[in-house]
Amino acid sequence: MEQRSSPARSLPPRKTTTTPQLSCELCRKRKVKCDKLTPCTNCAASGTVCVPIYRTRLPRGRHATRPRRVSSPPPTSAPGETDRIIQPSVPVNEDLQERIYRLEALIQGMNSHSHTRTPSATSREQSVQLSDTSTFQTAPNPNTSPILNSSIVSKRLMLQRPDQFWADLVDEIHGLREVVESSLAGGQEGPIPSSDSAKSEPPNDDGIQVLGLGASNPSAALRSMSPLHNPVVARQLCEVYLQQVDPVIKILHRPSLNRWMVQGEPYLSYADGHPAVEALGSAVCYSAISSMTDNQCSVMFHANKADLLAEARVACETAIGRAGLLTTRDITVLQAFVLYLVARRSEDRTPAVWTLIALAVRIGKGLGLYLDPETETFFDQQIRRRLWFTICLMDLQASFGQASEPLISVDESASTALPQHINDSDFDPTTAAHSDPNREGLTDTTFALVTYHAQRTGRLLNFVQHDRKVDGGIPTPTSSTSGTSTSRSRTCDPSWPQQQARHFEQEALRLLHFCDPGTSAYAWFTWHGTQSLIATVRLAAARPLQWHGQAPPPRREGNTELLRLCLPVLEKAQLMHTDPRAEGFRWYVTIPWYALAMALAECYVSSDTALVRYAWPLVESSYLQYEATLGQSLGGPFGQLMRRMKEKLAAPAALPPSSLPSTNWSPATPPTFPGVPRPQSSHDDRHAPGCSWPVPTGSTPPADLGVPSLLPVSTWEALSPPSLDNPSLFGVPPTTTAVADGMDPGADIMWEELFSGIPFNEIAGPDTFFFDMNWGS
């Protein structure tokens, strides 16, 4: 009788003493044929280090003997239990076992939710949910089985969305098939990597290079990442990010980021060197450099900003590609990609960012960011909402820049509640629920929440035909009947845009309650930035990009309302570009081209000599600042309009030269409106630390601001100059018109001709319904 091999003996006896050479590490990973040279041809062509493998080939197919159990099998799991722990006496493939159990847990979890739950089963499920850990929670307990952790994560992903079960099932089956095929392929495959190594090494070729991301030579890209991997450099860039980027783009948790990049602790529950964490760190460094000025880069790193940006961009793209962006199910990878888009948009004027924002929208929808799952921690909820509304904000900004409809509809942008008005220090990954949902006063999320409100109002005012389902939260006479009647009420009700603007003002001023602009640079920026947003919303309500009806209403002779609405927008933008307290946030601010184009057209057709004389220095300075931002002289319709305006001013019958002073703009003397109170000009807070914003409680705004602590729409009236007050701002236009002498009889036609001849996709690039990413520092 043939003697059977023992269980501990899984390899056939060697016939020779020579250890064969198998495929190298890289060829094995790529699953390509290796010529087994030293180095092999594939590694030499790619410029990587060839690591040959010398070992005995493993048996395959029917020649492979299965290990036998010595101990008794484990007891059968109890009903309703979705995880089993098998402890064989001989080593087995842990990754294969983990994937099988995770697949079983996924299917059993789906079956348990398809039947009626008993009270005992519900209590057991709640006990599992309380121990649920996610990507953004603390590190797992080392005594806990990795199989149990993975099954809970799979169960949580399945519960997040009804249709997510099939996506999870396909992913698990695909991963299981890869493990089985890799163990049986070609004979050159070695031991299957463990689950930890599998998580830390996702496929690095998911087609990301077709989008223009990543480097053609990964080894060269990794070498270029070395300066950013310097702990000292990473710590400095993280501090810059927390001071200049995080207050505006609020998608990360400040304490967690600080503990990771500054103090050297692990990031949430990720393992060291995880590709998602590497991608996030590279994106933080890239966005921090993009927010710095040339002087900051020279002082801090003794290098040119352009060189640092190029290096950081390649490193960020390579890290995002290694993290598997196109196939990711990890919210951290999406956070890194959003930060990458924010940074790239500040330096790249091509439509590439507009195209890539669509990818962020798709990934965000695929992860269900716009949904409110029942089973998620407070930490996950806040991070998810912040990321979704930031993507909505960027989607609207991109639609303005490329004359396109937003990808996210109004109902999707309002499908989930806004993040809480709290500080990041108020919660952490272990917070089960937040007892105090909102704070009064300035918080880490104040300015971000204002922009979240503004992006939704911007969709309603400028792209009202894009969505017909949501009536903007303001009841209209016919909004309760159907989507068609809602759209008709928007079109026919002339007061609907003003209602939306009034609603936004109330929400924005509520967030500014107890905000003292003299406490820090962030408080100053939030105060004036919110005023600029309110002024821009007023302008959009009076003159949106897309009219609700068939054609815009005719311009009345002598009506200067639009010009008066444009001036506060331009004034605040110039203030941000000239005041030293806005230096850290200037990368985010740009000259609002829409208000500038409208002001130019209004100045050209207006015959109000006093108003044009007052407005022209501000308009001309804004135009020059816009040209400086673009780095070139404006041509096309916008430049033609400016030339025609200068020709009109140079004409003998135009305004007297003495009445048009030359533009003399300096940071020390920003333009002011008569009667507009302004905060004190002391710069004691310009060097305020940016990592921990002071939150004054129980204080009231200074008396010199002229703004009560919290008032609705009438609050803005205190900020408006008496000479610019207009009773038709939120009501019916005045019945009387001030017909000035010498009014051009064709002013109405000329105004429409000039303004309609300025396509904003030609003159503006991505710009602002509100603040947007600038094209330069």
Curated annotation (Swiss-Prot):
Keyword DNA damage: no
BP-aspect Gene Ontology terms: DNA-templated transcription; positive regulation of metabolic process
GO cellular component term, pick one: nucleus
PROSITE patterns xref list: ZN2_CY6_FUNGAL_1 (PS00463), ZN2_CY6_FUNGAL_2 (PS50048)
Compartments where located: Nucleus
Family annotation (SUPFAM superfamilies): Zn2/Cys6 DNA-binding domain
Alphabetized CDD domains for the sequence: fungal_TF_MHR, GAL4
Residue spans of biased composition, Low complexity class: 475-489
Positions with biased composition (Pro residues): 668-677
One GO molecular-function entry: DNA-binding transcription factor activity, RNA polymerase II-specific
Disordered: region residues: 1-20, 61-85, 111-144, 182-213, 419-440, 468-496, 655-699
Residue range(s) of DNA binding per entry: 24-50
Key words of the record: DNA-binding, Metal-binding, Nucleus, Transcription, Transcription regulation, Zinc
Pfam families: Fungal_trans, Zn_clus
Protein function: Transcription factor that specifically regulates the expression of the ada gene cluster involved in the biosynthesis of the linear tetracyclic TAN-1612 neuropeptide Y receptor antagonist.
UniProt-recorded name of the protein: C6 finger domain transcription factor adaR
Source organism of this protein record: Aspergillus niger (strain ATCC MYA-4892 / CBS 513.88 / FGSC A1513)
Gene that encodes it: adaR
